[in-house]
Amino acid sequence: MNWTEIDTWIVIIGALCAAGCAIPGTILVLRRMSLMGDAISHTVLPGIAIAFLVTGSRDPIAMLIGAVVVGLITAFLVQAIQSIGKVEVGASMGIVFTVLFAFGLVLMRQAIDHVDIDPDCVLNGAIEFAWFDQNPDGWGIPRGAIVNGTMLLANAFFMLLFYKEFKITAFDPALAKSQGINPGFMHYMLMTMTAATAVAAFETVGSILVVAMFIVPPATAYILTDRYGVLVGLSLGLGVFAAGLGHVSAITVPTWFGFSGTTTAGAMAVAGGVLFVLAWMFSPSQGLLVRLLHNRRTRSHILAEDVLGFLWRVEERSQGSVHTNELHTALGVSGGALSKVLRRLVKHGAISREASHYILTKSGQARATSLVRVHRLWEVYLDKNFPQDSHQLHQSASRLEHVTTEEMQSHLGDADTDPHGMPVPSDE
């Protein structure tokens, strides 16, 4: 890999764009409005085209004003169609997005004859050539870095200025209103930031990367943390890392398969997606692997309690120890899962084993007694408040007994017998 100054600036510009998009993107994700970033990123196209047609140049101020105005119109139309048309927000965004984007493409075709503009550049970007677009007095800094860096600073300024307001309105607009915060103003402030950020990055990196960086880094951070401040910082870091990883991948990975390279903007978006998948799988709090392990432990815990309850009921009928096959048939679980649970219960001293037969120990007896007591109290409670047939009553209690806390048990009351006429064990 032959790294040059151009590669460094490509990564810097991509990182500035990603960080700038991640700031409003974080609020969009928290407000469950991620697709609004997608919609605005595309619907600012008419504003850009109108600015081209009116001014006859690529004046950034005119582009910014046109894009922001159309972005705010997009947000207004989405809310208006949702409330007046009584349709859900996704449908209203789809209507506004497709109509305005198509209108923008029509205008863009008209602008081609009057202004030096490439629609493919606007849609897909040309970050690989951003280094060559420099202002004469720009001290060797690409214009894309200046524009996206300025947008990042502006977004950071407004985020810090309205940090509390953005936080409260993202989670509870009603609470924000009660504290004197105007949720409508904050909403359109967010839409303005989104539209301005989109147009700042459009020509340099294209709409594909803009949309990806609005959504993917904040969504990835959302999986990794539940703290607002950490979420914002993590979104910025993930966006910057995705930009660097994407460019390195764009110039190295294709060579493994005999190709010279690929589009950097697309590779940056893919890198962000890869980071999201890794977070989705391995997040310590919400990752797929953690959930699978938690579900496995939960199933094992429930099966262990079912074994103790079954052994207790067998002893209640004075039938002595229980054979493994009898447990397997009664509980309806696989032999492997049952064997693991039995070994663990023996190891913890809850049951003892003689040949292929099992019996409760003293500690296991106490634990099983408490479990059966809760089960039968649930049957009493459900029969009194939610009458149902005896089989359904037993099944409902069998599920509830595993999740009952001491506070829940205190509301179940007391009883001598359950609806089946069986005695409720004492809690002593």
Summary of predicted features, one role per range:
Residues 101-158:
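Transmembrane helix-bundle core of multi-pass membrane transporters
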Residues 140-212:
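Helix-loop-helix "hairpin" substructures at the membrane interface of multi-pass membrane proteins
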Residues 11-16, 64-69, 91-95, 145-150, ...:
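Hydrophobic alpha-helical transmembrane segments
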Residues 268-310, 402, 406-428:
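Membrane-interfacial segments at transmembrane helix termini in multi-pass membrane proteins
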Residues 17-22, 48, 52, 72-76, ...:
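Hydrophobic core segments of alpha-helical transmembrane domains in multi-pass membrane transport
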Residues 1-18:
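Membrane-interfacial amphipathic/re-entrant helices at transmembrane-helix boundaries
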Residues 317-428:
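Structured cytosolic domains appended to multi-pass membrane proteins
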Residues 26-117, 221-240, 248-261:
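Short loop segments and helix-boundary regions at transmembrane helix junctions
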